[in-house]
Amino acid sequence: MTINTAVRIARLQVRVFRHPIERPVITSFGVMKDRPCVLVCVEDDQGVRGWGEVWCNFPSVGAEHRARLVNSVLWPMLEGRSFASPRQAFAQMSAATAVLAIQSGEPGPLAQAVAGVDLALWDLVARRAGLPLWRALREALGSPVDPTADHDPSEGDQRTVPTAATARHSAANGRIPVYASGINPDSAADPDGPRQLVARRRAEGYTAFKLKIGFEPERDLRSLRGVQEAAGPGADLMVDANQAWDLTTALARMPLFADFGLRWIEEPLRADVPWAHWQILRACSPAPLAAGENVAGDAAFDALLAARAVAVVQPDVAKWGGHSGNLPIVQRVLAAGLRHCPHYLGGGIGLRHAGHLLAATGGTGRLEIDANDNPLRTLLCGSIAQVSAGQVQLEDAPGIGAEPDLDAIREIKTLTL
């Protein structure tokens, strides 16, 4: 079928929520002491609504600012306008904010605001068509779903180029592999934290886990051993350094991880260093390298792909590009024989969008699901957090498959525009 992607925007509302948490989320560059969420709702002239989410984790005070960018910068250029597709709206928003991004020194927040609106528009289009979003995205790609496609999620060597047969998972039925991420290192106050969290998530059905590293070597290794033990035989392990090291330090740290059988090492270097540094590191890394959440724009992703230093590419739909920007990126990732594992660390609406993008595009990747407690994820994402044998099932309901329960989180709302 051919879906109608045209949309006339009648209304837009943006809301900010902040949920306090007992256990902060710790990274090598900062700490999250609450869980923020910026939700965008777009409504067309027929009363059909779509939902998106704007990345807003850092800096910790930035969520409300991003909401104001959506309302004050983007809404005036969208109100009452008709677009042939979300892609056209994305292109026009991106072009119209390009100079402002330079002048304000805020390319990131503006791109994140644009991404959130784009996500909402695609959800709207899919709901109106009566299709789950991943099916609508596949139709937009000109790739009707193959109902016979299937994939065993027990991947082999990550360096292997997928064949035509293996480059499809069971997303033909909306079922996608996932992994538990955001696992904090141990600490003096919580020495068994990583082990206990992984044990709980393993009992819930997760089979792959990613630990945050980039701290003292002894702490990294101690935490990783605890995670490995709690995960048990057959589990897949990954680590994320969150851009903690320069090349010299990374070269010294790589051998420490040689005996863990890691599926990938994520962001061992800053995302803005020359790709030549990544190529040097790749040559001696005991595991494939992963990056992409801090890459923005077609040219930047093309440079990443051309360097052939990264085997696992991790764009974030709420941080840059939405679906309009990321659909062609993911197509190029898969055509290059690399893995697309969408990055995501936020509320439930954005998580659903990331899962639908993975289901739409196929490949051998996994969806990232934050292992830490986050009511703004669990209250908003529904069944996508219900894991079985390392996979989740996306509903067949229209759009992202869920309507956010705003009443359940009303008391933690900090802003409505």
Stretches found by the model and what they are:
Residues 140-173:
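Intrinsically disordered, low-complexity terminal tails and inter-domain linkers enriched
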